[in-house]
Amino acid sequence: MKMCFPCLQCFCSTSDDKVVVSKNDKGGESGKKFRLFSYHELKVACDGFSSKNKVGEGGCGAVYKGRLTDGTMVAIKVLSVELESMRGEREFISEIAALSDAQHENLVNLHGCCVEEATRCLVYDYMENNSLAYQFLGREQNRNSFDWTKRKNVLLGVAKALAYLHEEINPHIVHRDIKASNVLLDHNFNPKVADFGLARLFQEGTSHISTRVAGTLGYLSPEYAVSERLTRKSDVYSFGVL
């Protein structure tokens, strides 16, 4: 079964056939490099997707810690995709569409992807301190070491990321799943908003879109859950819960 990925048409090849450069909405190069990885390369990076390298798992797949041949530590998200039903394909395309041209210090950095038959992988920077959820729901000593200064910095970082997604980048992006497990923390506890599998793009001047309700119970805004009208305020509500 031959697959077509229109979202990858926004990239142009360089002299290295494994590296592409994303284009901005005006047709010019944005300067952000995006790499196409082979499945074998990623399998070697995380020791055959060994369970000892698994750092997380969700409804869309598992995440593994890996080391590329140049020594770069990465997080490899392996999505569960069924080619017949296309389950998981929408999430894969949404993440690439949202992050391929986005550059902000409080967004997780997407290095590239792997597309081989039914395999769909996304490669990100590895976050040494896992997620905000891990810090608060894990060991008690993690919670005790997470002082108010760190908490304030995390909240400010997430707020800056949302302001960038909602106002600065075009098309605008609504994340739809802001929650503690989707806020990753680097070695200095700087927050990085992650997991754009449910994200939706908003063209300039668009106030809302009608779409099926998706997200996490407890973080969903009531008006979105009832009306199925998605706005940027839905992310703001989730941020308030966070």
Curated annotation (Swiss-Prot):
Gene3D superfamilies per record: Phosphorylase Kinase, domain 1, Transferase(Phosphotransferase) domain 1
Alphabetized PROSITE patterns for the sequence: PROTEIN_KINASE_DOM (PS50011), PROTEIN_KINASE_ST (PS00108)
UniProt EC number: 2.7.11.1
Residues bound to ATP: 55-63, 77
Signal peptide residue numbers: none
Residue span, Protein kinase domain: 49-242
Catalytic residues (UniProt): 177
SUPFAM superfamilies: Protein kinase-like (PK-like) (SSF56112)
Disulfide bond residue pairs: none
Induction notes from the record: Neither up- or down-regulated in response to zinc ion contamination and in response or to mixed metal ion contamination (cadmium, copper, lead and zinc).
InterPro entries: CR_Ser/Thr_kinase, Kinase-like_dom_sf, Prot_kinase_dom, Ser/Thr_kinase_AS
Pfam families, per database record: Pkinase (PF00069)
Catalytic activity: L-seryl-[protein] + ATP = O-phospho-L-seryl-[protein] + ADP + H(+); L-threonyl-[protein] + ATP = O-phospho-L-threonyl-[protein] + ADP + H(+)
A GO molecular-function descriptor: ATP binding
UniProt keyword annotations, A-Z: ATP-binding, Kinase, Nucleotide-binding, Serine/threonine-protein kinase, Transferase
Family: Belongs to the protein kinase superfamily. Ser/Thr protein kinase family.
Name the record gives this protein: Putative serine/threonine-protein kinase
Biological source species: Helianthus annuus (Common sunflower)
